[in-house]
Design a protein with these regions (language model features):
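C-terminal helix-coil-helix/basic helical segment that borders enzyme active sites and/or dimer interfaces
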Residues: 165-175
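Active-site pocket-lining segments that scaffold enzyme catalytic pockets across diverse folds
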Residues: 157-164, 177-180
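A composition/biophysics-driven feature that prefers long, compositionally simple stretches
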Residues: 1-159
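An alpha-helix initiation/capping motif
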Residues: 114-118, 174-181
């Protein structure tokens, strides 16, 4: 809904929280700060496209029936600078993204991005795409919660409250944190 109301033609997200929101996938805490996965959602489509490590892409095809198998793609970008842009991964994926946007009829519209590595931003621009702020559109989308989301948030909050209560009961002078955990 937020994308449909915006001037954006698509959202390209690389923030793990936004990827989870658009695709209902998460591969673990280790990928949190790597900018190694990304998802694309075009205006007028309810089908996100997800790029992930090859083995994770295969896993999504097998165990994420809510995603179209052909929309679970293997991909790798710069891993926050550890893969040199000269290797060509960013250029290749920017071209792939531009082609998908052309196919969806939104390539001439701005692409909203939440976070990105600068070399990938430059490659998207070289591919002829106009890049815009997509963070606010994603935040607007995430404001609206279903009854199930609210129930899960309440359950998670209750679990945290319970954990803090147990810590509070055990915490006394002379007790070390690692003894409680």
């Amino acid at each position: 809904m937020a994308l449909e109301k915006s001037e954006l033609g698509a959202l390209l997200v690389m923030d793990t929280n936004n990827i989870r929101y658009l695709t209902s996938t998460k591969i673990g805490e280790w990928e949190r700060d790597k900018i190694c996965r990304w998802a694309l959602l075009t205006k007028g489509s309810a089908e996100p496209i997800l790029w992930d490590f090859g083995s994770a892409a295969v896993h999504h095809r097998l165990y994420a029936p809510w995603l179209k198998p052909e929309n679970c793609k293997a991909g790798l970008l710069g891993l926050r600078g550890t893969v040199n842009p000269a290797f060509g991964l960013m250029e290749r994926h920017a071209g792939e993204i531009a082609a998908l946007l052309r196919d969806a009829g939104v390539a001439k519209m701005p692409v909203g991005i939440d976070i990105i590595e600068p070399p990938m931003l430059f490659e998207l621009q070289k591919a002829g795409l106009t890049v815009a702020d997509g963070q606010q559109t994603m935040l607007e989308a995430r404001e609206i919660k279903s009854i199930d989301e609210i129930a899960l948030l309440n359950r998670a909050a209750a679990m945290v409250d319970g954990a803090y209560h147990l810590v509070h009961e055990q915490l006394k002078p002379g007790v070390r944190e690692n003894d409680i955990v």
